Structures are given as C-alpha cells and as structure tokens.
Amino acid sequence: MSLEKDKSTVINNYKLHESDTGSADVQIALLTDRINQLIEHLKLHKQDHHSRRGLLKLVGRRRRLLAYLSKKDNARFRAVSERLGLRIKA
C-alpha cells in the first residue's frame, strides 16, 4: 500500500495537467524514485544480482526517456533533471 501512496505523490508532484499520469516528466520521476529504492536495497544486499540487473534496465529506460525529452523540449528536460537532482552532460 505504501508504494501506491508514494507513486501517487510522485505523480501529483510532477504532472503537467490534472489528468496527467504518463508524460515523460512523470515517467522519469517514477523511474528515479524506483531507482533510488533499488540503490538502497542493494546497499544492504550486495549479492542480489537479479535486482542489480533490474536496476540497470531501469537506468537505461530513464536515460532513453531523458534523451527523448531533451530532443523534444530542452527546457522541460533541464527543469526535470534539476528538480530530481540528476547530473546531465554539458
């Protein structure tokens, strides 16, 4: 249940309009939240290679979404990256 509450708060923080649940901004924010949870999990469970592979897949998906957003709307890309604390190439 707590994951759904976390997910809904992330969606509410990053949505572009009232019924927005799938824009690139929201998807990137949700992936970043899940990535951060997996990083914390892997700090405790260093030998969990299945979760590590899942983490790498999520990072790749987020990277592709960020590349799409940077091509489509660079201002939104920079705003989302800054808001989430992501490092971007200069």
UniProtKB/Swiss-Prot annotation:
One of its GO terms (biological process) is translation. InterPro entries: Ribosomal_uS15 (IPR000589), Ribosomal_uS15_bac-type (IPR005290), uS15_NS1_RNA-bd_sf (IPR009068). Pfam families: Ribosomal_S15. GO terms for molecular function: rRNA binding; structural constituent of ribosome. GO terms for cellular component: cytosolic small ribosomal subunit. The keyword Ribosomal protein applies. The keyword Ribonucleoprotein applies. It comes from the Bacteria. Keywords: Ribonucleoprotein, Ribosomal protein, RNA-binding, rRNA-binding. Part of the 30S ribosomal subunit. Forms a bridge to the 50S subunit in the 70S ribosome, contacting the 23S rRNA. Belongs to the universal ribosomal protein uS15 family. One of the primary rRNA binding proteins, it binds directly to 16S rRNA where it helps nucleate assembly of the platform of the 30S subunit by binding and bridging several RNA helices of the 16S rRNA. Forms an intersubunit bridge (bridge B4) with the 23S rRNA of the 50S subunit in the ribosome. NCBIfam families: S15_bact. This is Small ribosomal subunit protein uS15. It comes from Herpetosiphon aurantiacus (strain ATCC 23779 / DSM 785 / 114-95). The lineage of its organism: Bacteria, Bacillati, Chloroflexota, Chloroflexia, Herpetosiphonales.
